[in-house]
Amino acid sequence: MEVVDPKIDPWNHPGSQPETPCNNCYCKKCCFHCPLCFMKKGLGISYGRKKRRQRRRTPQGSKIHQDPVPKQPLSQTRGDPTGPEESKKKVESQTETDP
């Protein structure tokens, strides 16, 4: 084991820095380049400032969502409009006529 000069800062020790600089490549080799690359690229963790997304704005001349809602017809009742009692009478009369 090599003797490390105590006067040198730990981050400047020989072998503490990778030989090549970090880059923007996301291949497996570059993801394991150094601990920082592993955190950023391999794990996807970055502690930088988050950029605020701006909303898309519609052009000033457009009239989207400016028209009033059109009147819709009233909902139709489903099934037999005569009511349940009359439909029961029809079923009873049909069962009596069928032998």
From Swiss-Prot:
Residues 1-24 are annotated as: Interaction with human CREBBP. One of its GO terms (biological process) is symbiont-mediated suppression of host type I interferon-mediated signaling pathway. The modification N6-acetyllysine is found at K28, K50, K51. Keywords: Acetylation, Activator, AIDS, Apoptosis, Host cytoplasm, Host nucleus, Host-virus interaction, Inhibition of host innate immune response by virus, Inhibition of host interferon signaling pathway by virus, Interferon antiviral system evasion, Isopeptide bond, Metal-binding, Methylation, Modulation of host chromatin by virus, Modulation of host PP1 activity by virus, Phosphoprotein, RNA-binding, Secreted, Transcription, Transcription regulation, Ubl conjugation, Viral immunoevasion, Zinc. Zn(2+) 2 binds at C25, C27, C30. Residues 47-99 are annotated as: Disordered. The cell attachment site mediates the interaction with ITGAV/ITGB3 and ITGA5/ITGB1 integrins, leading to vascular cell migration and invasion. This interaction also provides endothelial cells with the adhesion signal they require to grow in response to mitogens. The Cys-rich region may bind 2 zinc ions. This region is involved in binding to KAT5. This is Protein Tat. It comes from Human immunodeficiency virus type 1 group M subtype F2 (isolate MP255).
